Each structure stands twice: as structure tokens, then as C-alpha cells.
Amino acid sequence: MSLEKDYIVADINLAAFGRKELDIAETEMPGLMSCRKEFGESKPLKGARITGSLHMTIQTGVLIETLKELGAEIRWASCNIFSTQDHAAAAIAAAGIPVFAVKGESLTEYWEYTDKIFQWTDGGLSNMILDDGGDATMYILLGARAEAGEDVLSNPGSEEEEILFAQINKRLKASPGWFTKQRDALKGVTEETTTGVHRLYDLAKKGLLPFPAINVNDSVTKSKFDNKYGCKESLVDGIRRATDVMMAGKVAVVCGYGDVGKGSAASLQGAGARVKVTEIDPICALQAAMDGFEVVRLEDVVSSADIFITTTGNKDVIRIEHMREMKDMAIVGNIGHFDNEIQVASLRNLKWTNIKPQVDMIEFPKGNRIILLSEGRLLNLGNATGHPSFVMSASFTNQVLGQIELFTKPGEYKNEVYVLPKHLDEKVARLHLEKLGVRLTELSDLQADYIGISKQGPFKAEHYRY
């Protein structure tokens, strides 16, 4: 590791390998490359100082270099301790962009790196956040509340909160008043994922959101593509790389049937598994049933299934009492953002055997064992390399457009949570059609008049559900 320079990566010598993969990824990310072509000359993000907290993968490297091409200064960390691709981080660091990300970093390092992405070498402040899961945003807002005298740091609810609060206290001591200054300097945040969006809506509901936010997750070209088609490819990839298990014929349980659950169930079904689904929502449960999946309660299948995957964004979905009853060598993993969907903390007093990085065998007193992937964190990124470049291009193009919106239009957005307008959603989709050889049908003037829309779109009302 290098501590002298303004980056922390596992091995800077991996930069050449990372650059080769970045070059390949660019050919699969037409949305981002179109943004460079459209906005590269005008540089709408000139003056933007973006703090980025998002999985430091090859695809994210293409996003980072797109933001730079559009004029932004950037400091970056991963939003997950296992999701960094070390060669990607090295390539970005070698290009002169400060990045603080190491695959397998500790939680203490994770929160130190989150602090570092706000610490500009000239002592300046970030004016934009690009977030995934909301940790960077939460770090600043919690610190500012502590500076205001609120008692928000005295009762940590987990080991991670203990470490987070310690890092906030460290910064409070080193730089009194810094959190409030940093909060007030922010023009806005764009948020990538369901979990982070929930946090933002909760803040807005309580009147605690101090700047505008764009909910990238609920752009159609994110949630219906990244969440669904991305998981459809990357879930099984992660399980295979971790375990080499034959999935055909196995019984797999997917907890949750939202967009991520739909993609995950399709992924396992495509690999030949017999898939069952658990759900709390009657609409999603009906969708699962009509898609051909048996909808069950976890308690009814916990002792007979072979693979368990959580996709919900909720906590305590798979609990210690469930895992205790699982068959020997059942595989347990999560593809939701945080690690609390599975009660991993309750397993710590059992016998752990590390098989290889991010694959652990845990033995219960009665002798049955489970295989836990990525310690309950995102297995598609911890055990594999995440979603393919093409689908991430759609998500990240939304991020770029969101950053441009908030940075270039100060005052036009209130301190609320917004979704990008329909015409931009359609633009993102359009940018990805040529790569797939798609030819759109065009409306005639009479047809457009008949249904009351412009020939150029938007083609659907805001309330339309895709």
C-alpha cells in the first residue's frame, strides 16, 4: 500500500492490467461514452468537487473517468469492504485520481477511507456526493448533527456503528466545525441504490435533508435493468466462483421478489435450480406465483433447500434459528446492499473455517455446516465482479445526468428527493440501442396525435409502470 501519495490501493503495479480492462469496458458502455462525446467540450461539471462512494470496479472506473472528462474533480472510495477490484482501483490511482479502496479492507479502514474522500489536499470542501447506499451522505449528516449538540453517537447498535461513531469523533476532535461546513457546501447528492434511497426519503420526511437529492435507483433504466438484468447474470456467477456447486436440480430460496429478487430468481432458474420465493407483499407474491415460482414461508423450507439468497433491503431476514435448521453444507448469501439481511453477528461464536477469500464454512453444535458467502455482504461483488459493463452503463449514465442536473441548476431543486424526468430516462435507453442492433419504429403524425404524445417522446406518462 502507498500512504505517501493521495491514494490507497492494494498494489499500484496492477494499473496496467486495470487499464486494459477499462479499455474493454468502454466498448460495452455506450451511454457513458456518449456523455463524453456530448458534454466533453462544454465541461458542465467544471468546478464540481465530487465525493464518490460506490463499488470500485472496472465499470465504476469508466464512470469516474467520464466525470473527469466532463470537468469534475473527484475523490473516490468503495461502498463495500469486499467489492473493490484492486486492478481497477490501481488504474484510477495511476491516472491521478485519488481513490481509497482495497478489496477486503477492514471496517475501520472503510470509514477512514470514507473520511478521506472529503479531505481535499488544498483544504477545500466537496460540493457534490455520488453515493451508493448512503454511507457518505450519512457520515456528513451524522457528524453535523453531533456538532449541533445532538446525542447521536452515544448508543451504537452494532460493531460497524461503533467504528463509524469512533471515526466521526476522531474528525470532530481534529477539525471542529468541519462537518457543518462540509454539509453546507453540498449542492446535492445522487443515490444509486434502493437502500440509500430509503434513507434519503426518510430524511426528507423528517425535514432533515439539507440539500436536493436525485434518486437514480428509481429511474426505469436503472431499477428495471441493473436491478433485474444485472442480478440475472451476476448472482449465479458469484455462487459458481465461490463454490463450484452444480445448481441444476438444487432447491434455491430467494427472499424477496422486488426487482433484485426477480432477477435473482431468474438467474437461479436459468441455471436449472428449482426456485422458491418468500414475500411479505401480496402484489409481489402474486407476481412470483404467476411467474411460476412457489411462494413459501422460509420456516417451511429451511431444512430442505440447498441455496438461500436474500434480496430485500431489510434486516434479520435469515436469522440464527433458520440457519441452525439448514441441511449440511447449505449455501447462504445476500445480494441486497447491506450485511444485516442475514444475522451474521449471531454466528460469530460458532466455529468458522475460511475456505478462500469471502467463502466461510460455519459449523453448528449439532454438526451441520453452512457455506456463507462474503460474510453476508453483496456476493455478486464479493465473490465475483458484479454486473456486466453494458447494464452498468445505463445506471451510470443516469448518475452522470443527475450530477449535471444538480450541479448546473442550483436553486431549481428544493431539499427533496427527485427522480430524473421521463425524457432523460428515455434518452438513457436510446443511447444503448445501437449497440444491440435495435431499430425503433417511428410514429406517424396521425398516430402521435391519436394517443396525444410527441413523435419524439416522452412515450409514456410519468405514472406508467414498466
Curated annotation (Swiss-Prot):
Q: Which InterPro entries match?
A: Adenosylhomocyst_ase-like_sf, Adenosylhomocysteinase-like, Ado_hCys_hydrolase_NAD-bd, NAD(P)-bd_dom_sf, S-Ado-L-homoCys_hydrolase_CS
Q: Which reaction does it catalyse?
A: S-adenosyl-L-homocysteine + H2O = L-homocysteine + adenosine
Cell compartments where the protein resides: Cytoplasm
Q: Which keywords are on file for this protein?
A: Cytoplasm, Hydrolase, NAD, One-carbon metabolism
Could you tell me the EC number(s) of this protein? 3.13.2.1
* Co-factor remark: Binds 1 NAD(+) per subunit.
Please give the Gene Ontology molecular function terms for this protein: adenosylhomocysteinase activity
Which sites bind substrate? 57, 132, 192, 222, 226
Q: Which cofactor does it need?
A: NAD(+)
Record's Gene3D superfamilies?
Adenosylhomocysteinase-like, NAD(P)-binding Rossmann-like Domain
Give the binding site residues for NAD(+). 193-195, 227, 256-261, 279, 314, 335-337, 380
- Hydrolase listed as a keyword: yes
Q: Name one GO biological process term.
A: L-homocysteine biosynthetic process
A GO-annotated cellular component? cytosol
Q: Which NCBIfam families match?
A: ahcY, PRK05476.2-3
Family, similarity comment: Belongs to the adenosylhomocysteinase family.
Function comment? May play a key role in the regulation of the intracellular concentration of adenosylhomocysteine.
This one is known as: Adenosylhomocysteinase
The species this protein belongs to is: Agrobacterium fabrum (strain C58 / ATCC 33970) (Agrobacterium tumefaciens (strain C58))
Upper lineage: Bacteria, Pseudomonadati, Pseudomonadota, Alphaproteobacteria, Hyphomicrobiales
